[in-house]
């Protein structure tokens, strides 16, 4: 009986280095999801595979401070710092949501030194779809 050929990078023989760290990504897509409670920044390659991500919560902000512009700026800086180290030079930015961190995250992305192809607002807007929830009485 023949022995199976060991595959490089398989789980059995143990990886020496992570596959994500070895990739060089010249161009990527930065997704910013800004809600009223938190801001999530995800960096993907052009095929949509996640390379790096960060949020205001993982950046050390808790409670109502997660929704602040400063928290969004910190989260964007943390997510982008890792991909700039991996060699990313150009990026497209997709911004989604009504949160306070939209502009602050974009400001942090612009300051990072990446060349931005375009900035697109992809906030979902209903064409009179579902009935919205009732108004809050505070």
Curated annotation (Swiss-Prot):
InterPro entries membership: Ribosomal_uS11 (IPR001971), Ribosomal_uS11_bac-type (IPR019981), Ribosomal_uS11_CS (IPR018102), Ribosomal_uS11_sf (IPR036967)
Family: Belongs to the universal ribosomal protein uS11 family.
UniProt-listed GO biological process terms: translation
Annotated region (Disordered), positions in chain: 1-24
PANTHER family reported for this sequence: 40S RIBOSOMAL PROTEIN S14/30S RIBOSOMAL PROTEIN S11
Gene symbol of the encoding locus: rps11
Protein location: Plastid, Chloroplast
Chain intervals with Basic residues compositional bias: 9-24
Subunit note: Part of the 30S ribosomal subunit.
Organism: Chloranthus spicatus
Name of the featured protein: Small ribosomal subunit protein uS11c
GO cellular component terms, A-Z: chloroplast; ribonucleoprotein complex; ribosome
Gene Ontology molecular functions: rRNA binding; structural constituent of ribosome
SUPFAM superfamilies tied to this protein: Translational machinery components
Record key words, sorted: Chloroplast, Plastid, Ribonucleoprotein, Ribosomal protein, RNA-binding, rRNA-binding
């Amino acid at each position: 009986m023949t022995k199976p050929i060991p595959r490089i990078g398989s789980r059995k023989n143990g990886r020496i280095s992570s596959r994500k760290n070895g990739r060089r990504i010249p161009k990527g897509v930065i997704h910013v999801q800004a809600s009223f409670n938190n801001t999530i920044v995800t960096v993907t390659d052009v095929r949509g595979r996640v390379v790096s991500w960060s949020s205001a919560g993982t950046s050390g902000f808790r409670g109502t401070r997660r929704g602040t512009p400063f928290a969004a700026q910190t989260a964007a800086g943390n997510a982008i710092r890792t991909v700039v180290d991996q060699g990313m030079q150009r990026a497209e930015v997709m911004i989604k949501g009504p949160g306070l961190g939209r502009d602050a995250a974009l400001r942090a992305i612009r300051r990072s030194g990446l060349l931005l192809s375009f900035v697109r607002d992809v906030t979902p807007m209903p064409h009179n779809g579902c009935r919205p929830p009732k108004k809050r009485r505070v």
